[in-house]
Amino acid sequence: MALQAGIVGLPNVGKSTLFNAITSSHVEAANYPFATINPNSGIVEVNDERVDKLVSLFHPKKTVKATFEFTDIAGLVKGASKGEGLGNQFLGNIRQCDAICHVVRCFENSEIIHVDNTVDPRRDIETINLELIFADLETVVKRISKVETKAHTTKEKEAVKEFNVLSKIKKALDNELPARSVELDEDELLLAKSYNLLTLKPVIYVANVSEEDYASPSSCSYYQIVKEIADREHAECVPICANIEEELSSLPEQEKLEYLESLGVSSTGLDRLVHTSYRLLNLSTFFTVGEDEVRAWTFKNGMSAPQCAGTIHTDFEKGFIRAEVYSCSDIFEYKTEKALREAGKIRSEGKTYLVKDGDCMLIRFNV
């Protein structure tokens, strides 16, 4: 599935350094505002130990991990919603993303200029959030002007419903609250999503801490501020050190593990960020396995077997007959598909089956 998270934040908070680490690419990461002029998109592999275990069992000719896309979006500044800095085109770039990774500076460094000259995570978060709120308010007000008359004069059911949803959202935005803070039922939420509002998108606050705070971010007062804000908003918060992550991304796997061990941590901040993005977007993984290939596929929780088959090839969904399914935890226990069959662990599932995280599937189809 082509889903992506946009990396946003004020200039010089570490967005491009983080992006370099995520993709092991080398976009410009200069020490001045707006080093990123066009959004850079990059694909990152999703590290999943289940893939490694499946490879050790099937010894395939080819291995393909699941992927996730991140987009580095230029630094926003106060007034961006009114065209300041690089303005509305970058707010438009965020609209194309499924989730927002909001990078917040949580380190002191006199050599890296802060756009407001001081490090203040609370102020920085408020600056970005207000710009997104102001941009959404403009969208909502324009839409209200189109449906208000119809809702009040014709009493058309859909127009009334849309006006009520927009009014709820506008009230929140007027109070400087994001659209995601509004309580909406399933139908109302579906309607709200059609406006592609920035503040309706799920958010991960990425606290970019110093090298000294990497192993124990909870000791960093700046991180604690970001965590407190995230908890209050029911958002996610992931501490990282972009400089260390960029360094780790260039190391061979064994050296990376040794470096992590020397730092006193078990996984990279980037792995945590990717897995948090997965969870935030309600994503899971199924597998296709065999001697030719072991591949991980991303799907949205709640998708049926035919829909998941369609992520492999559209013909698989059109001509879907059934899927032979077993869990990867069972293959890890029984070691071979033959042993799974003898134990009755391979199921035949039809069109209504909802795929589960960790399913291994063989699709039967006819076109």
Language-model region placement:
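Conserved G1/Walker A P-loop phosphate-binding module
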Residues: 1-111, 147
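C-terminal-of-GTPase-core extension/linker across diverse P-loop GTPases
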Residues: 2-8, 13, 19, 146-354, ...
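Short capping/connector residues at structural and topological boundaries
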Residues: 6, 34, 39-42, 49-51, ...
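Generic signal for short, ordered secondary-structure residues
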Residues: 16, 33, 69, 73, ...
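Glycine-rich, flexible loop/turn motifs
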Residues: 25-33, 40-42, 50-53, 82, ...
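Amphipathic alpha-helical transducer elements in NTP-driven molecular machines
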Residues: 34, 48-51, 64-70, 84-97, ...
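Conserved Switch II/interswitch segment of TRAFAC-class P-loop GTPases
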Residues: 42-47, 74-84, 95-159, 172-185, ...
